[in-house]
From Swiss-Prot:
Gene3D superfamilies in the cross-refs: Flavinator of succinate dehydrogenase (1.10.150.250)
InterPro entries linked to this entry: SDH, SDH_sf, SDHAF2
Keyword Glycoprotein: no
Domain of life from the UniProt record: Eukaryota
Biological processes annotated in GO: mitochondrial electron transport, succinate to ubiquinone; mitochondrial respiratory chain complex II assembly; protein-FAD linkage
UniProt entry keywords in alphabetical sequence: Chaperone, Mitochondrion, Transit peptide
The protein's role, per its UniProt record: Plays an essential role in the assembly of succinate dehydrogenase (SDH), an enzyme complex (also referred to as respiratory complex II) that is a component of both the tricarboxylic acid (TCA) cycle and the mitochondrial electron transport chain, and which couples the oxidation of succinate to fumarate with the reduction of ubiquinone (coenzyme Q) to ubiquinol. Required for flavinylation (covalent attachment of FAD) of the flavoprotein subunit of the SDH catalytic dimer.
Disulfide bonds: none
Listed name of the protein: Succinate dehydrogenase assembly factor 2, mitochondrial
Transit peptide: 1-28
Keyword field contains Transit peptide: yes
Amino acid sequence: MLRKTNLSNITTLLRSARCMNRMPQLRFEHTKGDLKRVNRSYETRDAMLARLKYQSRKRGILETDLLLSNFAKDQIDKYPVSLLREYDQLLDEPDWDILYWCSGEREAPEKWKSSQVFKELSKYCRSQRNHTLRMPELF
């Protein structure tokens, strides 16, 4: 069965869940050196594209999966390697943070406010608010 959701409903659900104290305010604190980045300097552009599309699709939170997988399908094929690396770094952020930042629920950190990839993702999120999203086809 295909799952569908509407991004404008996501924002409403997030707000109502917080108002009813069903969902805690999630805060993720990162300390330097938490995660070691995998050395992918050997990775070809095609391999990087395939990996990023997969990682965009398999996040863990359906709403973020839908947003990122559709964004990746529509946008990242045209990115140069430098922007693909930037998108790769964005995918290292927690799902809830990405969703809150893109939906405007929370202010994004300065690092991402100035990011071209994040600006395009936020614009994409706003443009999809009234659309029903579904997972893109794998092939």
